[in-house]
Amino acid sequence: MRYLPLNSEDRSEMLARIGVDSIDALFSSIPEASRLSRDLDLPLRRSEMETQRLLSGMAARNTPASSAPFFIGAGAYKHHIPASVDHLIQRSEFLTSYTPYQPEISQGTLQAIFEFQTQVAALTAMDVANASMYDGSTATMEAVLMAHRVTKRRKAVLSGGLHPHYADVVRTVSKMTDNDALSLPPDVFAAEDLAAEIDEETSCVVVQTPDAFGNLRDLSPLAAACKEHGALLIAVFTEAVSLGLVKPPGAMGADIVVGEGQSIGNGLNFGGPYVGLFATRQKYLRQMPGRLCGETVDADGRRGFVLTLSTREQHIKRDKATSSICTNAGLCCLAFTMHLTLLGEAGLRQLARVNHANAVDLAGRFAQIYGVEVLNRSFFNEFTLRVPGPAAEIVEHLAQKGILGGVPASRLWPGEDLDDLMIVASSEINTDEDRAAFASALRGIA
């Protein structure tokens, strides 16, 4: 795209067309006190080499996840990604985050989305999955809005074990759409406690498994309670690898399953871009947000792929749309699909088993440290410790010893009495030496 600067005559003509005579008049709605009346205090320009040196120095102040034993999770997980994944997604046919506006021309892209949908539906044990959402939190929010549409009710009950950032997104959108989101305290996540909050105004109950503390949940009793009251059960996950080992939410009676797919095929990426997964039952298909890619045959009987449903506001009338999502996380869901395809069903199961075994081994080491308590009865690759003292200080001491050792619960739930809780994750990247070093360092601090 060419850069076409404006001259003074161009500016005058544009200002006259909109009925003002100066730039100052154009911005008259901005109070004088809020305007910058001087030039920006910027340093002199730098050469490309100087700029690279400056930015490299700034980046060197970070501690990369790959440079130290890494046990941080809490919604974003570090896993090994085969080099072939990054290589393949950089092919020119794929290297875009956007779905084409003439999608049927791009059969390769549509087939990749179709395969992604098939994989997500299989992983979650649901009937149908969409072409992806922005991330797990927005997928959760969209699931709540979908439940409101399906049930014609306006109240969502959010488990205390739901990741607090996900709950924040749901509460924000609920406030803007005149809906009600009841967030329970972080210690309220038992099925009977959640069921007690369901009433005739409840459209859905949102529960996470593994939850934000790492606990695995049996959703079956809650699914029965939701069905009895005419509400939907929304199951959330932040660690997609867990689906290779634990019972999928669909098999436990969930009506909508949403979550974060980052841990398959995608790096930590400083918190994004990520890929939201969204799956549901066939009977709710037309209330599902985003796009749905389908398989068909053309006039000559050849297999082909099309966008079967696109009930978003860019395609249909805004008041009829199920969502205002603008695009799907195309490149991220492609990476997800490629990684999962390379693993296969047996490979994913083995990866999940290694994750679980590593976490069990680490928890066993911690259980032998005086003053440290593992709080979880069942977990996948993440669990919560009670430590003797503020967890934030212990995490800082661990970092000084070269170990990135978890997330203080107080960082996720500020204001709650959780200062002595620390959430720890362990995946296939953690060696026996890493786990031994972590346990030794924690023993020295605790």
From Swiss-Prot:
Gene Ontology MF term list: glycine dehydrogenase (decarboxylating) activity
The entry's keywords: Oxidoreductase
Record-listed E.C. numbers: 1.4.4.2
Similarity section: Belongs to the GcvP family. N-terminal subunit subfamily.
One annotated GO biological process: glycine decarboxylation via glycine cleavage system
Family annotation (SUPFAM superfamilies): PLP-dependent transferases
Quaternary structure and partners: The glycine cleavage system is composed of four proteins: P, T, L and H. In this organism, the P 'protein' is a heterodimer of two subunits.
Known catalytic reactions: N(6)-[(R)-lipoyl]-L-lysyl-[glycine-cleavage complex H protein] + glycine + H(+) = N(6)-[(R)-S(8)-aminomethyldihydrolipoyl]-L-lysyl-[glycine-cleavage complex H protein] + CO2
Function recorded in the entry: The glycine cleavage system catalyzes the degradation of glycine. The P protein binds the alpha-amino group of glycine through its pyridoxal phosphate cofactor; CO(2) is released and the remaining methylamine moiety is then transferred to the lipoamide cofactor of the H protein.
Organism: Methylocella silvestris (strain DSM 15510 / CIP 108128 / LMG 27833 / NCIMB 13906 / BL2)
Entries under Gene3D superfamilies matching the protein: Aspartate Aminotransferase, domain 1, Type I PLP-dependent aspartate aminotransferase-like (Major domain)
Entry annotated with the keyword Oxidoreductase: yes
Cross-referenced InterPro entries: GcvPA (IPR023010), GDC-P_N (IPR049315), GDC_P (IPR020581), PyrdxlP-dep_Trfase (IPR015424), PyrdxlP-dep_Trfase_major (IPR015421), PyrdxlP-dep_Trfase_small (IPR015422)
Alphabetized NCBIfam families for the sequence: PRK00451.1 (NF001696)
The protein's enzyme class: oxidoreductase
Protein name: Probable glycine dehydrogenase (decarboxylating) subunit 1
